[in-house]
Regions:
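Glycine-rich beta-strand-turn "strand-cap" elements at beta-sheet edges
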Residues: 35-50, 72-110, 140-157, 161-163, ...
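Short acidic/polar capping segments at secondary-structure boundaries
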Residues: 94-97, 117-123
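DNA-recognition helix of C2H2 zinc fingers
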Residues: 62, 169
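Alpha-helix N-cap recognition
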Residues: 56-60, 164
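Short, structured motif recognition centered on aromatic/hydrophobic residues
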Residues: 2-7, 18, 49-53, 109-115, ...
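Short amphipathic alpha-helical segments
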Residues: 14-35, 60, 66-74, 120-145, ...
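Short, extreme N-terminal leader segments that mark the start of a protein/domain
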Residues: 3-5, 9-14, 204
Length: 208
């Protein structure tokens, strides 16, 4: 399964307008893929909308990326978006495809999006080590997806769902205390290029 995580910088006070426009844009007849997440940042770089879309094939992802880049009104936000970055990913092969909350049972509304740099040669070891550790960690709080970038610097992004900020803090502390997280040996393959963003589900987000 392939994914795009698009990041738009928006003027203050336009998040609701943008979320509605994004839903409409993703449902247009010519659109490829499926809208899965639409989140607005709360902690980290502010005034950013994060849009997660899923694709059955790389060809569909590339076609939709081209449609968006060539559009005069990308995501229906051309008049307000100040920046747009589209990052392409492939899900870790052992992970289930991302599904909306109504199907998966995974709910936020708080989502943490973490991106880690990977050292050369570290992609497959990272995938394998996470396969061993995520099931136990998922039982503490659900991992929505772990996915490796297919362009740009070596990196992967993982997304986690929590009912509240407090629940996130407790879940992470519990996982460390139980010795189930981070994956044993996993950090050795990572660089110090790490980011974490806390974002809240918008009213139109399938991952609510």
């Amino acid at each position: 399964m392939y994914y795009e995580l698009a990041t738009m910088t928006l003027p203050f006070g336009t998040a609701a307008q943008a979320a509605t426009a994004i839903k409409t844009y993703a449902a247009e007849p010519q659109a490829r893929g499926e809208l899965l997440g639409c989140w607005f940042t709360d902690i980290g770089v502010l005034n950013q909308m994060l849009v997660l879309r899923g694709f059955d094939s790389l060809a569909d992802l590339q076609a939709e990326r081209q449609r968006t880049q060539q559009s005069a009104d990308p995501f229906g936000c051309g008049a307000i978006a100040q920046t747009l970055v589209q990052d392409s990913y492939q899900g870790f092969p052992w992970m289930q495809p991302v599904r909306p909350s109504a199907e998966s049972g995974i709910h936020g509304p708080v989502y943490e999006i973490r991106t880690y740099g990977i050292k050369p040669g570290g992609v497959q070891p990272t995938i394998d080590l996470w396969a061993q550790s995520v099931p136990a960690r998922h039982a503490v709080s659900p991992c929505v997806i772990a996915m490796v970038a297919i362009d740009g610097p070596l990196r992967f992004t993982n997304i986690w769902a929590y009912p509240s900020i407090q629940a996130r803090t407790q879940a992470r502390a519990d996982a460390v205390a139980q010795g189930i997280w981070p994956p044993k040996g996993g950090p050795a393959w990572l660089t110090t290029a790490m980011t974490s963003t806390i974002a809240l589900a918008t009213a139109t987000s399938p991952l609510a």
